[in-house]
């Protein structure tokens, strides 16, 4: 039996993506949770974005912020408007020295290979937009 890419025993299908940026963890965190940064990777919020609260975006993403540890990570429910399932997204900030940080996206509880492929394309596009925005800021 061949193992399917991204299939786990415990959390269904997953997709992960990470990239190192020439920023401190605090700089990376501050950008990703600024209005511009949130707009890129999460969308334009139509609600407050707070721990243990539901959120929604103009793009039709909704969920609940479950864990929020500044300069470390966020874990939240994440659902597209067209989906029947609630998935989980975790964004981590990992220091690689004083001025380098890995920004890591892990998307769990995807329903299958098709949803994983959709999210692979989605998060790669988001990472490209994050990179372009940071490059434009001189980072």
Can you name each region flagged by the protein language model?
Residues 1-46:
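Hydrophobic ligand-binding cavity/cleft-lining segments
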